[in-house]
Amino acid sequence: MASILDQYEDSQNIRQHSRMSTANIGITHSGFVNVRLEEEKPIFTKQRIDFSPPEKINQFSVCNNQLCMSLGKDTLLRIDLGKPDQPNQIELGRKDDSKVHRLFLDPTGSHLVICLTTNECVYLNRNTQKVRGLSRWRGHLIESIGWNKLIGSETNTGPILVGTSQGIIFEAEISASEGSLFNTNPDQYFRQVHYLEEDGKPAPVCCLEVERGLETKYFIIATTRKRLFQFVGKLAEGSEQQGFSSIFAQNQDLLPSFQEFPVNMGYSEITFYTSKLRSRPKTFAWMMGNGVLYGQLDYVRPDSLLSDVQVWEYTQDIDLNFVKPISIVLTQFHFLLLLPDRVRGICTLNGQVVHEDVFPEKFGTLQKMIKDPITGLVWIYTEKAVFRYHIQKEARDVWQMYMNMNKFDLAKEYCKDRPECLDMVLAKEAEHCFQNKRYLESAKCYALTQNYFEEIALKFIEAKQEEALKEFLIKKLVNLKPSEKTQITLLVTWLTELYLNRLGQLEADEGKQHLFLETREEFRTFLKSPKHKDCFYNNRSTIYDLLASHGDVDNMVYFSVIMQDYERVISHYCQHDDYSAALDVLSKHCDDKLFYKFSPVLMQHIPKKVVDAWIQMGNRLDPKNLIPALVNYSQMGSMQQINETIRYMEFCVYELDVKEEAIHNYLLSLYAKHKPDALLWYLEQAGTHVSDIHYDLKYALRLCSEHGYLQACVLVYKIMELYEEAVDLALKVDVDLAKSCADLPEDDEELRKKLWLKIARHVVQEEKDVKKAMNCLSSCNLLKIEDILPFFPDFVTIDHFKEAICSSLEEYNKHIEELKQEMEEATESAKRIREDIQEMRNKYGVVESQEKCATCDFPLLNRPFYLFLCGHMFHYDCLLQEVIPHLSVYKQNKLDELQKKLAATTQTTKARHKPREEDTVSLGKGQGSREQIKSDIDDIIACECVYCGELMIKSIDKPFIDPQKFDQEMSSWL
C-alpha cells in the first residue's frame, strides 16, 4: 500500500483567499515605505495527501504524529507519520453489523480506544497488533474521553474521564500490560463519578477536558449540546493516581457551574490552543448552536477557568436546519470552522472571516476536522480523501488588529521584526496617549517613531508640556547614533535650557523643594552622561553661557568638575572666599600647574593648609615654581606665613633632598632674618667641602656679614679655604676658633705657621697673655720660641721665657742625638751591604749535563743560559722571548737598542783577525764596553726569575688572549 504522507500532488493553483489585510499605503511622516515585493503566501495552505483508500473512511484520529483511521466495517489503518512508508493494517475481527462510532487517541499517541455502534469498546496499544476488549465499558456509547496528560504513559493511561451519550461521566484506567491469570482485561476499573443533564433529561457528554492549574488545583470542563460545565477542585499532594472522583465530590453539594445557550443543534465541540509542548492551554473555542464561544483560560481565578469570553454568531449562510458546522479547530489567532463543503477561518481578535476554502464535490462531504495537539497540523477527511493544512506566519497581520484595538503592547510584540509596522504602531500609540493627555507616555512613543522631529516638538510646545517635550528630547537623544553630531549638539543644548528653566521654576517654589532636588539630580546625571561626554566637552563654552545666563552657580561648578575644568572651579571658590574648598579641589586632582597658579592667593589666607598640601604632593611639585608665592608673603605676611614658608623649605631640603641653589639660598635668607639659631646648624650640616655645598658661598658670606653672624662667616671662609680671612675674623670671636682654622691647611706648613703666628701675635699684642702665647708653641710644632720673641715688648723679663727656652734647647739636643744615631745606623747598613756583595761574588751553582731549559725543554748546555737562585734555568733566547711581552715600552726599546750595540761590537771583534800593537788599548776598551752592554741586558731580562718574580705575579690579571687579537683568535676557531 502506498504511503499517504511521503508523496504529495503537484501544487494546486491557490485562489486568493478572503482575509484581513490593509492596503499598501506609506507611513505618514515616516522613513519607511511599505512595499511588498512579492505576493504573500496565505496563512492556511491546504495539501491533499496522495492516498486513495480501498474502502470508505469512517473515523479518523491523529495525535503525536500517530495517525489512525477506520476503513469500511472491520479495518483499522495505523501509521507512524515519522515512518509513513510502513503503514500497519489491523483487522478488528467483528462478525456482526457493528461499525466504528468514534476513535479516541491519547496525547502520546500510544492508547487508542475504538468505540463501536453496538455499545462496545476495544483497546489497541501502539506497541501491539492485538485488539483487546474493554468489558467494563460494555453497554455505553462513548462520546468523549478526557485524557490524563500529567501521569499518562505509553503503557498506562492513568485515571481518565469517559463521557457517554446518556450524560454519565465515568472514571477509568487502561493498562497495556497483559494482566494476571484471572484478570486479562486492560480496563483496570470503570466507575461513575457524575451525571449531566439538560432540561431535566440526560444529555450526551460531547467533550471532556482535564487541566491542572496552580499547585494541586484541577479544572474539568465538560460540554453537552447546549451547556458548558466547569468542575474545580483540589487533589491532595501525591494523590493524582487516585483519580478525579474527589473533585466531583467537592462539587456535589453545589449547584453545577455551567453556561447555557438556547439553541440546540444536536451536538457541540470544544477545542483548545496550547502555545508550547507540555504546557497548559491558553485559549478555548466552543462550537454550539448559537455560534462559537471563545476566550482565555485563567488558571488563577478560583471558581472559573474561562475569562474574556465572547460569542461569534454564525453568519447568515449557516442555517442549522440545512447547513450545520461539523468541527472546530483553534489556532493562536483563528478558529477554523468545518462546514459540509468548505473550511472557514475566523480571526479571534476581531471576529472577521479571513479565510474560506471550498472543497470540490468530487471528494464528497467533509466528515471531520482534527488538529494534532502536539505538532499543530490540521487534518480534514472525507470518505474518499485526506487533506492537511499548514499554518504559517499566522501572526503577520495581528499587530494591526491589536493596534486598532488600542492594545499597543501586544501590537508591538507582534511586529517587532518589521520596522515599518512598528513605526505605525508607535505613532498610533503616541497620538492616542496625546489625545488622552498622557503626555509623557506620548513623548516616549513619539521619540521612537520616524515622524518629523519639528512637528512633534511644536505639538508639545503648543500644548505647553515642557516635561513631555523634555522626555521626547531625551529619548530622541538616546536613539541618535554617535555620528549624528549636529543633532546631538542641538538636543543637548535644548535639554540643558529646559532643565535650567525647570530648576528655576522649582527653586522659586518653596513647596516643591523635594521635586527641585530630584530634578537637579536628574540634570546632573544628564550632564555626566558618558555617551555625550564629547558633545559636552566640545560645546562647553555654550553650556557655560547657559548656566551663567540662569545664574546657576552650583551647577556651573558641578559641570566644570565633570569637564575637568578645575581652574574655573578653583577660581570660583577663590572669588567667593572659600579658600579651603579651592584647596580641596587642588589636592584632589593634583595638577601642578594649578598649584603654581593659585598658591600665591591661597598662601595669603590659609598658609598652613597650603603647605600641608605641598608636602603631600612631594616630588610632584617643583619648589622653584613656588618661590614667588613664598617670597611675596614671607616679606609682607604674618609670622605664621613665614614659619610655614620655612617649614616647606626645610621639607624640600631635608626630606626631598632638593639641590637647587635658589632653594638653599632662600632658606639661608629666611634663617638669617627669622631663625638665626638654625643658621649655624644648617651651615655645619651642609658640609665642609665645596662639592657638597648647594648654596652660593658668596651669597651666604654676604648674608652672614650683613647680619653680623661672625661665627657663621668664619665657617663660610673655612669652606672657601680662605684660611687667613677665617683666622682674622675668628680672632674677633674666639682664639680657640682661630686655632681650629689655623690647623686646616695640613699640606701647607708655611701657611699653617703663618696662621699660628697671627694667633700668637694676637695673644701677645692684644691679649698680652704670655702664658697663652707659650701654649701656642705646644699647640703647633711649627713654631719655635725664636719665632714669637719679636712680638714681645722689650721690657718683658726672661723669666717669662725660661721654661720655653729650656724646652727649645732640649728639643735641639734631642734632635742632634737622633741624627747621630741615624748616621751610625747608615754606616752599619753600608758595611753589611758590602759584605753581602762580596758573598754574592763567591756564590756558584752546579749544572748537570742532563739539565733542560724550563721553557723549551731542550738540553740546557747546548746554548748560552741563565741560572737563577730559585733553581730555574733558561736558554738566553728562551728567557728573552718570555720576558719581552711583559716589559714596558720603554724597556723594550732600551733592550732593542742594547742588542743592536752588542751585535755591532761582535761584528767589530770578528773583523780584527790580528790586532795590531797600537790597537791593544782600544781593544781593551771595546772589550770593556761589550761586557757593560751584556750587563745592562742582564739587568733587564735576568734581574729576576720570570716564573718566580714580580712579572709572574703581575700577569695574574692579564687575559690569556690579547684584546687586540681576540677577534682574530675567535674567528680562527669558527
UniProtKB/Swiss-Prot annotation:
Pfam families: Pep3_Vps18 (PF05131). Residues 905-930 are annotated as: Disordered. It is found in: Late endosome membrane; Lysosome membrane. PROSITE patterns: CHCR (PS50236). Residues 461-481, 799-852 form a coiled coil. CHCR repeats lie at residues 618-772. One of its GO terms (biological process) is endosome to pigment granule transport. Plays a role in vesicle-mediated protein trafficking to lysosomal compartments including the endocytic membrane transport pathways. Believed to act as a core component of the putative HOPS endosomal tethering complex which is proposed to be involved in the Rab5-to-Rab7 endosome conversion probably implicating MON1A/B, and via binding SNAREs and SNARE complexes to mediate tethering and docking events during SNARE-mediated membrane fusion. May be involved in vesicle trafficking to the hepatocyte apical membrane and play a role in development of the intra-hepatic biliary tree. This is Vacuolar protein sorting-associated protein 18 homolog. It comes from Danio rerio. The lineage of its organism: Eukaryota, Metazoa, Chordata, Craniata, Vertebrata.
